[in-house]
Amino acid sequence: MQFLFTFIFLLIPLVYSLPAASPKSGTDFDFNQEIETFVEQAFNQDDPSQAAAAAASFEEFLVNVFNYDQADGQVDGQVLKVFEKRDANTEQTIEGILKAVNNSGVIWTLLDSVADDPSRIEYIGNLTSSFLKNYNITLNIADLLSESSSLTENLNITGLLSAVENSGLITSLLDGILLDENFRPRLVDLIDRLVLSQKNVLLYIFAGVLSKRDLMADGELVNVLLKRATSNDDSYSGSLGSFLNNAASTVLSSSLVSNAVADVLNALNDTGFLVYATKRFLSSDSYINMTVALVNDIVSSSSVTIDTSGLNITELISGTLGNPKEIAALVGSLLSGDSSQTSQLSNYLGRYSGALSQILQDLEKKGLFAELNSYIFGDSTTKASATATATATATSSANGKNVANNNNKDAATSGSATSNSSTSTNTKSASNGAGAVIYTGSNTQTTFLKALTILFGGALLFL
């Protein structure tokens, strides 16, 4: 469940991060017309050679994967057995499809047509919310994280993780994101924005969990992070969720899915498609803003109920942090280059230790830790009232950031993506001691803040 847990901690700050670029306004969005226009432009039906090539490719796909009989135009009835006995041709077919889709630019053309127009984003958000609202979907976070849930009991997590590891996809993704020095400024900028959007969460950790004070109850914190819906009037409430849960357990535990996952993962790794797509997506503020807007619309519409009643925030944080002093010491040693103190950490991080050290140093140059230190612990000239609460400090100082829209999306694949902000030291206006409920006049917590940056804003680095 490490992947799910990491995804939750990444999604929450992403949703609550302020948009960094303003998409241009457009006209009313006619979904059907847009799809027709898009298909006509992307696939030129007047070109016989292109049509013939597309037909041949599709027929080859049917023959190799579905055992398609061209004579009678039927698919063999033993489709599932064919899937389970697939050979290397299937993986090659998937690779060919990925390359064809990527080279056509279909994905990015479609994303651009939506991301650059607020009315289209709103339309898709409303359409999705209306569809989901009819099914009364409830996500129980505690149940998903529990090893005893019906989904995790039937799901072969070990097999899926093994398939991911054997494909080499995670290594390729980490190499492409962390070791690309041209992409690193963009990564630093994203981490900076995500962490600043979660200043109140950090305040809760320091002033509530680590200080053993009840600054904010777990339920109150969750209400700040996620908007919960309370509509349970339907007597059949949860029936669809139970069905989908059981169906997903059955499907995901089958050898059919395991084989398919392995082929797809290998194809994604061999083609480099995922690394390219991830870097290109992260290089565009308009894509990020679109994602934030869509998730906000869905969550705010209460079409999906997120149940966190069984989630013990304090226990999760305490278990994640372990020994705070030890973490702070390791991060401090990593920054100072003291190899005698960080040999074990360096061995664990391997070739990424240098990249992580540089990321932390760049974040320090941007003034991230100084701002967090001032916001949470106060400075030597300011002492905050002990009655301040995390909810009273909801306004993030990230409002002062101006990040230009990155139009060069293709730079990601060539390793030439550029940062939207300089890594030179920036002067940021922080509410000195605004959240310093417990600590005042201390700069000794800076290394600990850097550690928390990795745990929360930088969780992507450890996927």
UniProtKB/Swiss-Prot annotation:
Residue positions with a glycan: 102, 126, 136, 156, 269, 289, 312, 420
Lipid-modified sites (GPI-anchor amidated glycine): 441
Induction field: Expression is induced by HOG1 and during biofoilm formation, and repressed by caspofungin. Also regulated by SSN6.
Subcellular location: Cell membrane; Secreted, Cell wall
Keyword terms of this UniProt record: Cell membrane, Cell wall, Glycoprotein, GPI-anchor, Lipoprotein, Membrane, Secreted, Signal
Region (Disordered): 397-430
Membrane topology, from the record: Lipid-anchor; GPI-anchor
Mod. after translation: The GPI-anchor is attached to the protein in the endoplasmic reticulum and serves to target the protein to the cell surface. There, the glucosamine-inositol phospholipid moiety is cleaved off and the GPI-modified mannoprotein is covalently attached via its lipidless GPI glycan remnant to the 1,6-beta-glucan of the outer cell wall layer.
Propeptide intervals in chain numbering: 442-463
Signal peptide limits: 1-17
Entry's Gene Ontology cellular component terms: cell surface; extracellular region; plasma membrane; side of membrane; yeast-form cell wall
Protein name: Predicted GPI-anchored protein 45
Species annotation: Candida albicans (strain SC5314 / ATCC MYA-2876) (Yeast)
Taxonomic classification: Eukaryota, Fungi, Dikarya, Ascomycota, Saccharomycotina
